[in-house]
Swiss-Prot record:
It comes from the Eukaryota. It comes from Branchiostoma lanceolatum (Common lancelet). GO terms for cellular component: myosin II complex. Keywords: Acetylation, Calcium, Metal-binding, Methylation, Muscle protein, Repeat. Residues 14-49, 50-85, 90-125, 127-162 form the EF-hand domain. This is Troponin C. SMART domains: EFh (SM00054).
Length: 163
């Protein structure tokens, strides 16, 4: 379809290979399609957070034959749509609100424990302490072991650029 061609152009070959590997992991019978239930898991593994409602809406948009399964072409179209949605600018008030939610103790910083809770939610328990510390050091500009709002904002912008 035209959407598939647009998706192929939008992604680098390396990204398409990553998507294909993730897709194939869940295509257990090798039939070339996966159930819609497994899609949420794949998208999480690829670092995309998406609500159940958003996922269902995306599935409805690409599952043209209403089979309840998604083939790789439909999956790639879906990933392209998800990426385009994620490119919208996040208003500062939304970023500040998210920061306040994550700053559980209200001290104006996201410390290691608060960040660990977020990372566990996003990546499961797959993240080791070393990986967590390495990530924190990459973005902790003043090396105080925690993120202030500006550092947090930089993380969000960087993650959006990666995807």
């Amino acid at each position: 379809s035209d959407d598939y061609v647009k998706a192929r152009v939008m992604f680098k070959e390396e990204q398409i290979s990553e998507f294909k590997m993730a897709f194939d992991m869940f295509d257990e019978d090798g039939g070339g399609d996966i159930s819609t239930k497994e899609l949420g898991t794949i998208m999480k593994r690829l670092g995309m957070s998406i609500s159940r409602e958003e996922l269902q809406q995306m599935i409805d948009e690409v599952d043209e034959d209403a089979s309840g399964t998604i083939d790789f072409e439909e999956f790639l179209e879906m990933m392209a749509r998800a990426m385009q949605d994620s490119e919208r600018e996040i208003p500062d008030d939304e970023l500040r609100a998210a920061f306040r939610v994550l700053d559980k103790n209200g001290d104006g910083f996201i410390d290691k424990d608060e960040f660990r809770a977020l990372a566990s939610e996003c990546a499961g328990d797959d993240l080791t302490d070393d990986e967590l510390l390495e990530f924190m050091m990459d973005y902790d500009g003043n090396r105080d072991g925690r993120f202030d709002y500006e550092e947090w904002k930089e993380i969000i912008q960087e993650l959006k650029v990666r995807w």
